[in-house]
Amino acid sequence: MKRSIVKNASLLGLFALLCTALVALVNQFTFERIKQQQDLELMRTLHQIIPDEMHDNALIEHCILIQDADVLGIDEPLPAYIASQGGEPVAIAMETVAPDGYNGQIKLIVAIDAKGEVLGVRTLNHNETPGLGDKIDLRKSSWVLGFKGQSIQGEQDKRWAVKKDGGQFDQFTGATITPRAYVGAVKRTLAYFNANQQTLLNRPANCEVQYE
């Protein structure tokens, strides 16, 4: 009887060990697949906002980490991607966060050329209200395309606000908080780049850990 109990316990232990190993293997495989999909989506986004003819490097491979909660809207460091042509930096795409969206944080990426002009903006993640605040998503509206070609004349540039606040950017019908937060995030990012352009564009890549 005792021998049977020990045998059954051993079998159960072995079964549990095998199940744990299988779950770990599946989780690792799933994580890698998700990571690959995220990287592919990021590369597609980068090529949308920084034209291929502007650079000859692999954008995702020249990644730097930037940490400034006041500008980026989040305590943790966020990646930025340097575009270069013939070894010379020509543009940057900076991830940033609008912490004051209607339904929480809005994560976006802002591409800026060496002259300080916006090349493009895209929304990476948000929880804004469908049919109202989700117009920040290019799949829902062309609103984000309005940032292309824009620049900033100092941090007090009053054009960088929604029209309801005296600025030049459209708000959404029934949803002002979302575009107001979004415009503010792009403005802060652009002002930060203008103030730190040489340091940012000439910083060596340091995102290796992120892409292991």
Curated annotation (Swiss-Prot):
Its topology with respect to the membrane? Single-pass membrane protein
Single Gene Ontology BP annotation: electron transport chain
Residues bearing PTM FMN phosphoryl threonine: 176
Principal place where this protein is found? membrane
Entries under HAMAP family matching the protein:
RsxG_RnfG
EC annotation?
7.-.-.-
Q: Which organism is it from?
A: Shewanella loihica (strain ATCC BAA-1088 / PV-4)
The UniProt family comment states: Belongs to the RnfG family.
Looking at the UniProt entry, the stretches that span the membrane are 9-29
Q: Which cofactor does it need?
A: FMN
Query: Looking at the Swiss-Prot or TrEMBL record, what is one Pfam family this protein matches?
Result: FMN_bind
Gene Ontology cellular-component terms listed: plasma membrane
What's the name of the protein?
Ion-translocating oxidoreductase complex subunit G
* Entry GO MF terms: electron transfer activity; FMN binding
Q: What does this protein do?
A: Part of a membrane-bound complex that couples electron transfer with translocation of ions across the membrane.
